[in-house]
């Protein structure tokens, strides 16, 4: 069943955006039921006078018990967008674009990155709808490593290719968690030392060198969080 996030309820119906109505027309929904997600709850609906008339509420929760945050260094836009999509499918609740020492700073000039935020949010919403999420991940503004290290979540893991391979990701995760992934070239030794001094767990992702977006998805997929 097709799924759409909605933000406005009117009695026994949901108000549909122009984009959603257009999508429903394209897929020729007609009288077939579809799912609206409102305030993290699922509702089976049918199209009625360009609104989504509620048939019944569906009691399902597809979210992790804990907050799962991905702090990922800014990389080439197409790869960053791919990571946004896959991270959403894997259940992250928040994504923090990260500015690091080895970040390609050309990507941050002339609003190349910040001007894409609406597009990024659309990618997150589409991925959340596709993967039957109860909510869309939050995309924050750009942060530095120091800012992320100062966040209140205590359970943090940072990927580093130079650490011993035996330093694997522990299982399972039983509290809110932040995963930190660097850009192409990884984190600098200075950044790793700073993270370690702030009680961040430095972990290996194996003997092979992974692309930044692959490393992010590998970390998320390896963790048993539910």
PLM features: what roles do these ranges have?
Residues 189-226:
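Structured adenosyl-cofactor binding patch, chiefly the S-adenosyl-L-methionine
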Residues 157-186, 190-191, 201-203:
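Active-site/ligand-binding-proximal alpha/beta "capping" segment
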Residues 61-157:
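RNA substrate-binding interface of SAM-dependent RNA methyltransferases
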Residues 25, 88-91, 196:
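Non-catalytic positions within long, well-ordered alpha-helices that form the structural scaffold/packing
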Residues 18, 97-101, 188-189:
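Short glycine/proline-centered loop/turn elements that form peptide/ligand docking sites
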Residues 1-60:
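N-terminal positively charged helical leader segments and presequences
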Residues 15, 65-69, 175-178, 197-205:
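Glycine/charged-rich beta-loop-alpha catalytic/anionic-binding loops adjacent to active sites
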